[in-house]
Amino acid sequence: MRLLLSVCTLSLLAAAASASAGPQFSSQQCGFSTPYDVIVDRTGVALTRSAGTPKTVFLHDGRLQVDGVAQPLSSADAQRLRQMEQGAQALMPEVAGIAREVVGITFDAFGGVVEAITGSSSKARKIERHRDAALAHLDRTLGKGQWQKEPFDKAFEADVSAAAEEMAGALTSGVMFAAFTGRADDVEKRTDAMEKDMDRRMDARGKALEARANALCVQVAALDALEQQLDYRLPGGKRLDLLEHSDKPAKPAAPDEAAMAATAAAHSQAH
């Protein structure tokens, strides 16, 4: 019973940890967020939202449109907007790269746990289609300069949850087989070895990912500084706020959180 409970706990921990470590950390971790959906491509930077005003903002080559209307700008502001556009174009591929690594860490952890418990690399490979689905979604969105927070988060969570459910089924079968055939010691040896190896590899990847995220924060802060320097004001006198400040940066999400949760739960199953 304890073994089966650990299997269920593992799937829940993995799903929760993976979802929380999703791509949204790149802005929240820095203490910035945006209320807009964003598209960045060669034609410019388009920001849209359904609630609040302005609803649409478009930047390109030093020009600004707000709710479809071209805005008068000083030459200094035009230059700042060019720099903001260039910064956004440099930022989006890096956000996509970080998101891909988060997906990689998450599903490597899933696969490692499945193989350690079941002793079957073929069963571990069965969850690869969920990794492929998550990466394909990244390619269709962030990979093309498109960021829509709510749909993106839901899709990422769905891929992770589906993999967690499938993994739980494989683990349940593996644990039951080991329990009834007297091979629990083999499972324990595999999970011990897996835990040590995964700790080492995921720690290194987690530190590298954290460094990339911190560098991303520097780029976001530079964009915010340019926005704060704009002399332009919206009709009514308000500043243009494309980036919003939180009171303080959110606690950085551990990039290897899913791996650590998975290995800890898997280790408990062998005892």
Residue spans of the language-model regions?
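Positively charged n-region of N-terminal signal peptides that target proteins for export
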Residues: M1-L5
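Bacterial N-terminal signal peptides
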Residues: S6-A15
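N-terminal Sec/ER secretory leader and immediately downstream segment
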Residues: S20-H130
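Structured segments of extracytoplasmic/periplasmic soluble domains
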Residues: G87, L91-E94, I98-E101, I105, ...
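Extended amphipathic alpha-helical interaction segments
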Residues: S122-V218
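A cross-kingdom marker for long, charged
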Residues: D192-H271
